Amino acid sequence: MAHKKAGGSSRNGRDSAGKRLGIKAFGGQIVIPGNIIARQRGTTWHPGLNVGMGTDHTLFAKAEGRVEFRAKTGGRTFVSVIPVAEAAE
């Protein structure tokens, strides 16, 4: 005679892997064209000068320069790449 009731299968116990989202190049860092600046879902950060946005909202550099984050009115944060020659002046 069994002394334990039959155990039901658990409905928990699974999780998805992290998607490695976030800032990849921080403010002040030097980037080259094609470098990924941020991976995001939606537009947490918006593309500014010399920054493009991919179909999955990834922000990438279009020119060589220094990354700069700037908050604008309306609560939006724009990411720009300031060319090194301009930054030196």
Swiss-Prot record:
It comes from Afipia carboxidovorans (strain ATCC 49405 / DSM 1227 / KCTC 32145 / OM5) (Oligotropha carboxidovorans). This is Large ribosomal subunit protein bL27. The gene is rpmA. InterPro entries: Ribosomal_bL27, Ribosomal_bL27_CS. Gene3D superfamilies: 2.40.50.100. One of its GO terms (cellular component) is cytosolic large ribosomal subunit. One of its GO terms (biological process) is translation. It comes from the Bacteria. It holds the Pfam family Ribosomal_L27. The keyword Ribonucleoprotein applies. Belongs to the bacterial ribosomal protein bL27 family. PANTHER family: LARGE RIBOSOMAL SUBUNIT PROTEIN BL27M, RIBOSOMAL PROTEIN L27. Keywords: Ribonucleoprotein, Ribosomal protein. SUPFAM superfamilies: Ribosomal L27 protein-like. One of its GO terms (molecular function) is structural constituent of ribosome.
